[in-house]
Amino acid sequence: MPQIILNARNLGSGNKTALLAVPWLGMLTSLLGNLSLLSYFAKKKEKEAMVVQTLGVVSTYVVIVQLALAEAMPLSYFLATSVVVVSGLVLNFLNYFGLLNAGIWRFWEDFITVGGLSVLPQIMWSTFVPYIPNSILPGATAFLIAVVAVTMSRSGKLSEKGVKFVGGISGWTATLLFMWMPVSQMWTNFLNPENMKGLSAFSMLLAMLGNGLMLPRALLIRDFMWFTGSAWATFFYGYGNIACLYFLNVISKEFFLAATVGLISWIGLAFWRDSVVHGHSSPLASLRDLVFGS
């Protein structure tokens, strides 16, 4: 919300350049990642996680609308994104309440698998243009691989392990999309440090807090994918950008130290409480169970 308010103020004053501090490619990866994770949690009936992901989709989409108004995002990409977002929200909630045909849901799962696997390498490549040649080859190659994999899975031409692997692609792709946003933001910070004042410190704090609050639940149920995405966003998007703002003298030393102490304390508390719940003698045992299984 603070980033949305800051963007609205800059738009209202005609300062469209300030919105370039927020990379549209980074916002797009976050949006698609949140939408795909929403499908993942809707299927698992994780109500609280669904609410968090829905808020993430809606708030990120509002930022994308602002970037489109500032002409910081191509109109064609914005329109395509809008169609996918509206469709995704409707389908996910219809499925959660048992109002969606199973065939339509399977089509949506295949769509986000193919779409996510195609978009991820393309966005990763495009982030570094013009330092590397502009090309659609990464996305096109991934698209063909994804279509073949999904087709073989649905037609029964894969082993049970192969079907399970393809079924898990969308979840991990969503996590990687979500994880790429901090990379895109850090790259933008590196290229245009003078635009950092257009980045809201309170938005980064909320990103750190929001993702950090998901860590205990992901740790408790031993969901490594969920934990990985939340931890990455907590450290690299939320705290990482707070660190950038501090080193560029945009925020105070007290703000930075409070965020640092708070984050370390919360992570320590989460692992300590988890070790108590599971009867472990050390928090490291909880980490071992998370990564390698109990």
Residue ranges and their predicted role:
Residues 1-294:
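Alpha-helical membrane-protein topology signature
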